[in-house]
């Protein structure tokens, strides 16, 4: 029988100043996207990558392939304002550097109210044979059905969300620092760490890990629908709560 150690620290009041740029997405007012992405001409040349960093308003759809293709496709078809779409094409850059693809803007861009909703925003389709890091800094969303990697790091820093159906990784690190949320339906591997520091929440459906550590330090919550594994350690120093259903067999 596997042994399980569970440690829950008492919650204490946690107050921290947060610098968040609100874009009023979905409102009737004009919002603004800001960017200061730096690059060289060589950075714009397509190269293999294992990490993704998105710092803008967009919906990102990632697909892992079993070949050697690394590609990024920008789809502007959902944007109904032709003038805004053209300005976005001029400002957006896809930078390939140090094994990472970074997508962002080179300056400020006002977003019309009609382009604020998710259904009318830019769609980004990304594929690669391997993925070791996801960084979401913008207001958009990141979606993936399945990711299989030796290690995977998820860093959600903005207002947006990360939603992944299935992750298989020897080591999985999830950091949620902003207002957005991280949702994983199934996670399986050896070691997993969840660090929830912001206002948002982290939810994992079924977790099968040899070792899982949860640190909840912000206002948001962490939910584990079902944990099965060796060791589970929970530290709750924030205002939010941590809830977990555990298989002790």
Label for each model-derived stretch:
Residues 2-249:
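Intrinsically disordered, low-complexity terminal regions
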């Amino acid at each position: 029988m596997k042994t399980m150690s569970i440690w829950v620290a008492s919650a204490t009041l946690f107050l921290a100043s947060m610098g968040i740029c609100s874009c009023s997405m979905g409102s009737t007012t004009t919002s603004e996207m800001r960017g200061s992405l730096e690059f060289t001409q060589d950075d714009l040349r397509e190269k293999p990558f294992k990490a993704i960093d998105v710092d803008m308003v967009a919906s990102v759809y990632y697909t892992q392939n079993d070949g050697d293709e690394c590609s990024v496709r920008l789809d502007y078809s959902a944007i109904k304002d032709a003038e805004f779409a053209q300005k976005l094409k001029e400002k957006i850059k896809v930078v390939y550097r140090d094994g990472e693809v970074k997508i962002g803007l080179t300056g400020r861009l006002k977003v019309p109210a009609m382009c604020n909703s998710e259904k009318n925003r830019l769609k980004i389709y990304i594929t690669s044979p391997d993925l070791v890091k996801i960084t979401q800094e913008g207001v958009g969303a990141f979606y993936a059905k399945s990711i299989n990697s030796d290690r995977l790091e998820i860093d959600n820093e903005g207002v947006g969300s990360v939603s992944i159906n299935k992750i298989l990784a020897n080591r999985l690190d999830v950091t949620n620092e902003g207002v957005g949320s991280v949702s994983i339906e199934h996670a399986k591997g050896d070691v997993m760490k969840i660090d929830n520091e912001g206002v948002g929440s982290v939810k994992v459906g079924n977790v099968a890990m040899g070792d899982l550590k949860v640190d909840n330090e912000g206002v948001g919550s962490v939910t584990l629908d079902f944990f099965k594994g060796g060791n589970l350690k929970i530290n709750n120093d924030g205002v939010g709560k941590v809830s977990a259903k555990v298989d002790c067999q």
